[in-house]
Swiss-Prot record:
Positions that bind GTP: D61, I62, R63, E64
Protein's organism: Elusimicrobium minutum (strain Pei191)
Protein name, as recorded: Nucleotide-binding protein Emin_0125
Keyword terms: ATP-binding, GTP-binding, Nucleotide-binding
Single GO MF annotation: GTP binding
Length: 285
């Protein structure tokens, strides 16, 4: 039986971004565990054989102390069990590490003066750096840039559903703006099908309503312009590390105009290669 499970071991200097990296892996859909004692690694991996998770990220740091020297052998044993193992080592300049510790007020795991602690940690982690498959210098990286770098490392391993999840939501302003919305657009400038006797009881998912709305040039013009704006914005949000985006489309009651526009945008974004879900909050109210 072929084992498709992949284990990414994240390690590196304290303050270089291990915790943030694990959060990013979690956003990518990985099953993440931080600070699992190395003595339990092989038992944990054996346990994973019967779990559904295929992508796992494990955090390792200097707090493992003398046990760190066993990691190369542990990795070799895990590979023998047919797991795909990839080690990422995070580093940053001494000055940046000092700055980060100063900003966060965290104490270094090695109880010494900070500069001395960083120097000792570098020396102790050198064997791990030497076996790492990828080393990332986070000195000048924003969170979004770190995520972008990790994305490139994982590009061959990530599932489609670990990409940015886009939700297009229709709603009625009289029922309140959705709290989860990242972007809100008001389409009440479009003629309202509600005032057409034959359309009043229908919704924006019905063909007669769609035809009515699209009979007005401003509807098509809006769709084209807003879609182009979203195609511009979405990659920018992804670059900054955003994993979820909720686009809320509102009209008066949330039954006609917003539903049609939300449905049309969902189809267009999907055709453009984005992962999109659609939800009509107030369509039955």
């Amino acid at each position: 039986m072929i084992n498709n499970k992949k284990i990414f071991i994240i390690t590196g200097l304290s303050g270089a971004g291990k915790t943030k990296a694990l959060q990013i892996f979690g956003d990518f859909g990985f099953y993440c565990v931080d600070n699992l004692p190395l003595a339990l690694f092989e038992h944990f991996v054996d346990h994973l054989k019967n779990r559904k998770e295929e992508n796992i990220a494990l955090g390792v740091d200097i707090r493992e102390g003398k046990d760190l020297k066993t990691l190369p052998k542990i990795i070799a044993n895990i590979k023998k069990a047919d797991f795909h193992v990839y080690t990422i080592f995070l580093d940053a300049s001494d000055s940046k590490l000092v700055q980060r510790f100063s900003e966060t007020k965290h104490k270094h795991p090695i109880q010494k003066k900070l500069i001395a602690a960083i120097a000792q940690e570098r020396k102790q982690l050198e064997p791990l750096r030497n076996i790492a498959d990828k080393e990332i210098d986070t000195t000048n990286l924003t969170l979004g840039e770190l995520k972008e770098k990790l994305s490139k490392v994982l590009v061959c391993n990530l599932k489609k559903d670990s990409e940015m999840q886009i939700s297009v939501l229709s709603f009625g302003f009289k029922h309140g703006i959705p709290l989860e919305a990242d972007l809100v657009v008001d389409v009440r400038f479009l003629p309202n099908p509600y005032y057409q006797p034959k359309l009043k009881e229908k919704t924006g998912l019905d063909s007669p309503v769609a035809k009515y709305i699209m009979s007005f040039p401003e509807a098509n013009e809006f769709l084209i312009k807003y879609l182009n704006m979203l195609k511009f914005l979405i990659p920018k949000y992804m670059k900054e590390g955003k994993s979820y985006l909720t686009i809320a489309i509102g009209c008066t009651g949330g039954k006609h105009r917003s539903v049609f526009i939300a449905n049309a945008l969902t189809k267009a974004l999907s055709q453009s290669g984005f992962t999109v879900s659609e939800y009509h909050r107030d369509i039955k109210k």
